[in-house]
């Protein structure tokens, strides 16, 4: 858990430099193993209250639990959302000047837990935040053809929406992704209001027509390195 506040060595992908902008939807995400989900949720709510009262610029901070994929049940996440990178770095300085925010919240829970960090972004408006139970299916991918991926992602969104999927389909690009994420340089995700909507969307995605389209237009341009499903706790 001490790694939660340490600076991690990161790599910048050349692909990212071409498509990540100074004004963006930014997600600063911590992947934590060995943490009780309820304790983390409570600590996150307490930290948010202190940080917002202290002038933090983050749009929101939430915690979630991994339901499917590698190490489900033992893996939790803290996601912090910003409108741009400047706000993120401003909050980093603010948190450093107010160490009690961390010490009195996250610092009181399991210090033996391990964590990794990745910062991801895109240049689109930030989607509206959901409530507890919001469900996200994701795949970390190594993009092998940036042009083809960028051309086909909007079409993929249209294909899923036309099929009636009640999910937001989008992607985020690595701004700083460490060894735990690399060689992936992006994440494709489905975001649903609840597990029911996600299940129905996954059924649509698994249909023969959608799979044929994906294998013809998306799969040739990516290598999937990890995938999973998570649900938000707050």
What are these regions, as identified by a protein language model?
Residues 7-18:
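Bacterial N-terminal signal peptides
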Residues 20-102, 106-212, 216-234:
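Short S/T/G/P-rich N-terminal loop/turn motif that feeds into the first structured element of a domain
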Residues 1-7:
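Positively charged n-region of N-terminal signal peptides that target proteins for export
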